[in-house]
Amino acid sequence: DDTETINQAIKEMNELGGGILRFTAGTYNVRTVHLLSNVWLHLDADATIQGLPGGDAPETTWFSDRAYRSGLSPTDPRPYADPENYLTKQDVGHTFFRNAMFFGERIDNVKIVGTGRITGNGNLVTSDKVMNNAPEKRCDKMFSLKLCTNIEIGGWNIDKDMWYDPQKDEPYYIDADGQKNYDVSNMLHIDQGGHFVLLATGTDGI
């Protein structure tokens, strides 16, 4: 589990004013990475960051409409059981942010870039009602950003439009001669992203 080592490195870089944390070839296992301002993550081509069970718990909250809380006590801080709160028109996705593989709140100037791979590794929940799961199985987001600015996630731009081949289930570029080019080694590869691959609320400049 590399979570604490990575989070400590991000914290130290942030305190120094920022920097680039480089992930060289290898596999890095994480629960929840805490993003901080002015710290960029760079993944080399043979680097993989993969999710582990046991990420951060959803933050505590409370809704006045008793029927939509998971508990019966008015002091129960747990999330409501139903995935939608119809009386307040609040989607659960914009209520809980911390149960994610990467989490940032009120941060600025953060990049997660390179040509490596980020995968939930089957450990990010893809269904509603995460509080019905065991505590270590409640992360349902890969990237969760709340009230952030100037965020970049991706590979390297090569000034070509990307297309999708439904037969091969793969992306491709179109070369100058009109041929399909399936070389996407310039991309950051992201898979198994959970219920919300990217949840950005009150966030500008992505």
Locations of regions flagged by a protein language model:
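Extracellular/periplasmic carbohydrate-active domains that bind, remodel
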Residues: 1-206
